[in-house]
Amino acid sequence: XQDPQSETDYSQLSGEWNT
């Protein structure tokens, strides 16, 4: 996704948003 709120999405992209 493109939402930083989506921890599930960014967890794979950045891994830092998974908090």
UniProtKB/Swiss-Prot annotation:
Keywords: Allergen, Secreted, Transport
Keyword Membrane among UniProt keywords: no
Keyword Nucleotide-binding: no
Any GO CC annotation of this UniProt entry: extracellular region
Location of this chain's protein in the cell: Secreted
Family to which this protein belongs: Belongs to the calycin superfamily. Lipocalin family.
Name of the molecule in the record: Dander allergen Equ c 2.0102
Native species: Equus caballus
Lineage, uppermost ranks: Eukaryota, Metazoa, Chordata, Craniata, Vertebrata
